[in-house]
């Protein structure tokens, strides 16, 4: 079965809208699609806070084999890195293990991006120490959650520190 061309991944790499934060969502594709409907909910909520550059991750048409692109895997890699560089915030659902998501997170750290990782402990899985151990409580955060509270958690994260705004310093002289 061939992989499908997915809506949301266009020829143009410029996806952001002027004046709106660019958000990069990471979720498992080739690592497993069990959480796809949850990804739809996350992407839908993220749209309230900015332009989701990678909304195709939640597409029903996208199966575990991924997608077809004219340039193959290399084009997908280059395009996703371009979007990652454009992003103001990276949000990753990390419950379903995925080499690709781990790679994206490593690159996001190297690009000094704000990162929020969401993990569901009730899944029975254990989150990699390389993800949980990277959390610094500021630029890189890992939040454990239950599926029913994902929208409220995203609201809390983005309303507390909206993208594009400088966080207030605890020291008023700085």
Curated annotation (Swiss-Prot):
Protein name: 5-hydroxymethyl-dUMP N-hydrolase
Location in or out of the cell: Cytoplasm; Nucleus
Modified-residue entries (Phosphoserine), positions: 28, 98, 123, 128, 138, 169
Tissues with expression: Expressed at low levels in brain, colon, lung, peripheral blood leukocytes, placenta, small intestine, and thymus. Expressed at high levels in heart, kidney, liver, skeletal muscle and spleen. Overexpressed in a significant proportion of breast cancers.
Activity control mechanisms: Inhibited by AMP and GMP.
Keyword field contains Phosphoprotein: yes
The reaction(s) this protein catalyses: 5-hydroxymethyl-dUMP + H2O = 5-hydroxymethyluracil + 2-deoxy-D-ribose 5-phosphate
Function noted in UniProt: Part of a nucleotide salvage pathway that eliminates epigenetically modified 5-hydroxymethyl-dCMP (hmdCMP) in a two-step process entailing deamination to cytotoxic 5-hydroxymethyl-dUMP (hmdUMP), followed by its hydrolysis into 5-hydroxymethyluracil (hmU) and 2-deoxy-D-ribose 5-phosphate (deoxyribosephosphate). Catalyzes the second step in that pathway, the hydrolysis of the N-glycosidic bond in hmdUMP, degrading this cytotoxic nucleotide to avoid its genomic integration.
GO molecular function, one term: protein homodimerization activity
Lineage: Eukaryota, Metazoa, Chordata, Craniata, Vertebrata
Classification via Pfam families: Nuc_deoxyrib_tr
Induction data: Expression is induced by ETV1.
Main localization category: cytoplasm
UniProt similarity note: Belongs to the 2'-deoxynucleoside 5'-phosphate N-hydrolase 1 family.
Self-association state and partner proteins as the record states: Monomer and homodimer.
Chain sites annotated for binding 5-hydroxymethyl-dUMP: 27, 29-31, 98, 100, 104, 128
Main EC class the enzyme belongs to: hydrolase
GO terms for cellular component: cytoplasm; cytosol; extracellular exosome; nucleus
